[in-house]
């Protein structure tokens, strides 16, 4: 904990995270039963939050599902706050229409190495030369003809057409066709070193914040649109609702099964050394 009574809470400055943290940010939901903890929100891109989690810096934080095997010793997954694609997810886009096998040996822009999109790319793409770029810079070199394709996350899933690019495939659709499960992309987790009652209070606060966002949809969406990175209101709301759904409030058995399958496949493909136990904190 970062000081007496202060909790550090990390999430990304994205429309979906802003929507689910709306009530916490605006002090509509407190942490704890009666005695409210002070909290300090840390807003950083997901790659930076992943790196902070690897150093166990924050009390509660958003992470990529792909990084959990590396932080499982320090963090426990919360049953709420997950970003799960329901038959959709990161996109592979190119300047000219083509098929996935056509990318073999080509240079492909990808977001950070700890992102779930990168893990999925290693599962489903042919062998390519990965070019690591910040997630919001992957499309430009493809549009300019410098790279063959890009793996696109966040708002780019809705704006790639504006850049004159073509969708080769939706990795979330490929995942669903093979597994029949939702695609776990992002998680919220809490430090194992915190007292068990405090971990449950943080879980309750985040679930309460998500519940309040659904109940105060217009205000929560207006707030979330401030983090839409230049996209219009209609697409900003669409993006937020893509990744804040029923499984965000409670991932349930389907979410746990999806995480287990993701790590099983990653271990089988030798992307990670071994599949970690999927340790999820539920209420009660």
Question: Language-model segments: which ranges?
Answer:
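Beta->alpha turn/N-cap motifs
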Residues: 45-47, 56-69, 134-135, 152-158
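Secondary-structure end/capping motifs
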Residues: 195-265
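Extracytoplasmic small-molecule ligand-binding "clamshell" domains
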Residues: 16-20, 30-64
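A local structural motif
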Residues: 29-42, 124-137, 272-278
